[in-house]
Amino acid sequence: MSTAVAEFKPSEKLLKTRNIGISAHIDSGKTTLTERILFYTNRIHAIHEVRGKDGVGAKMDSMDLERERGITIQSAATYCQWKNHTINIIDTPGHVDFTVEVERSLRVLDSAILVLCGVAGVQSQSITVDRQMRRYNVPRVAFINKLDRTGANPFRVIEQLKEKLKHNAVPVQIPIGLENDLKGVVDLVTMKAYYFEGKDGMDIQEKEIPDDLKELANKKHEELLDAASMFSDELTEALLEGTPTEEMIKKAIRTGTIELKMTPVFMGSAFKNKGVQKLLDGVLDYLASPVDVKNKALDQNNNEEMIVLESNYEKPLVCLAFKLEDGRYGQLTYVRVYQGKLSKGMTIYNMSNNKKHNVGRLCRMHSDEMEDIDSAEAGDIIALFGIDCASGDTFTDGKLKVSMESMFVPAPVISLTIEAKESKHLNNLAKALNRFTKEDPTFQTHVDPESGQTIIKGMGELHLEVYIERMKREYGVELITGAPQVAYRETITSKADFDYTHKKQTGGQGQFGRVAGYMEPIPLEETLDYDFVNKVVGGAIPREYIQSVDKGFKSCLERGSLIGFPIIGVRCVINDGAYHDVDSSDMAFQIAGRYAFRQGFNKANPQILEPIMKVEVDGPSEFQGAILGSLNQRRGMILNTTEEDAYCKTEAEVPLADMFGYSTVLRSSTQGKAEFSMEFSRYAPVPRNVAEELMKKYKVNNKDED
């Protein structure tokens, strides 16, 4: 750790710590920006481009796969110093298939930089990332990047921030020139012009604002003061007296940002080395320190009551494992310390299973390299070795029994069957699956009890492709993969009664249980998959067997009768039944519940639901016809098309079942000039012809069972 920070008292050290994420739509230049930040803060001594000719790749893209594809898959952690402050940076993926990485890193950050492309503006994944930041109350500044590119228009992007993301977006800079003429930025707080000259933009020249920009700068300066004064009475009074200071303005902007009521907007081009150092100043000036953020935990001794943790190193330890990685040094667990102090040699307890662990080695991470340290305090993000745990586990020193609230994990929407080409690789396949499912909660695996096949599930084709590739590279396992399968669901559309009596007499104690009631669809707005309501009165079913009926119902949810997929959106109400003093049992009522459910389900007009994806396609306007045609052919419903500067953006909803192989089709129909992203939107009923086809297929595959 740098001595500059080590000398401060812990509270002072905390005030000078920033835990930030850099989040964006894919290809907005996020990893390039991180690379420049590391360069200007002396963490690296040469710049390598993401897809550079030197073949080195960006520092933060440490997996071979990432360097080849030029996309960031795992969020690498690193730290740097800037003007006596420590900045911990999590570089997060921009591809929608890797949103769990973004969710995870936002969970442990105090604030973030939202990177936007100066040409494309707010894109679908920018909206997803912004929604995730909102979920975790992450204050953010925006950086409009790529202003050196043809068609760049930062003010249009600011309007999109306001309209699409509903941000109170306020520029704190304006660019000096655009496209090939981009030279620097005007700072609207200091009202000075800054030029980035010399090799790699290291030489920053402060000058007066150019005459042709004075009018615009004054106008935007007034707008900034108006916006900032909403968060500071001191600034409002100073403005009335005509004596506002830079410090007052910065303090007001900082307050608005941390309260999530304002988004300061910075500008530049990371690739052309313009504006990055001023953005770093903005991180220190406007983004939250660990002290500014309220982190909550659930008190396990007090009915999971919410408590607020203090960023204080003298309090009992609470930390969260937010990422696991198998590196060249063994299993690494990335940890954020929220309260207390974590030291080498101390004993910590995993709150999910009460297991004790001894802390053997602590490190600060710089992508895939590391630096050993003796201790870490509240606010630090570090890595531990040899701790067996799952992502999202909470650790304490045993003095507190609390757990951090669990992270929101989206359900997988796609599955594939896999098998090892050679039986000698089965052991390695099991190891790989065990590790990857621990690392990534959206990557799931199970063995189909009927076919005996191993099935992997994930967030999209690319997500599963990356894991298949990693199994090959890291474990030497060649796989045979089946066709991707859609995660269909089954539900009911009307209310239906059930009344089933289970009777069995085979000498000795028999089995008896009667269950009666009805099932009905749960309205979509309730977002419940299943609900059980007990309205039995007068002891028609004894209290101890009510749970047995519920268990029987639940056992039916895994496999519907239409095509064998899970059942959702069903409320089961029991209102009558019967029992026998001798023959009734837990098992008898479970079986009665199971058959009663099937009886009701088949009468309640069941239907098949399919995942509908929100798809966004960006490409040159000349290909708009081809893009619309390709979506219409896939049962797509066009929601919106916008056209700006010879570029068109098409938003549509398309069933996932029709999106397989779309990237190849899009590439060939637009000469590789269009790109698309998709994310899960909702479940919707499949058309009748598709439902009939699916049921026919299911019957053929399962005819031996009946």
From Swiss-Prot:
Transmembrane segments: none annotated. This is Elongation factor G. Catalyzes the GTP-dependent ribosomal translocation step during translation elongation. During this step, the ribosome changes from the pre-translocational (PRE) to the post-translocational (POST) state as the newly formed A-site-bound peptidyl-tRNA and P-site-bound deacylated tRNA move to the P and E sites, respectively. Catalyzes the coordinated movement of the two tRNA molecules, the mRNA and conformational changes in the ribosome. Pfam families: EFG_C, EFG_III, EFG_IV, GTP_EFTU, GTP_EFTU_D2. The gene is fusA. Residues 15-291 form the tr-type G domain. It is found in: Cytoplasm. One of its GO terms (cellular component) is cytoplasm. InterPro entries: EFG_II, EFG_III, EFG_III/V, EFG_IV, EFG_V-like, EFTu-like_2, G_TR_CS, P-loop_NTPase.
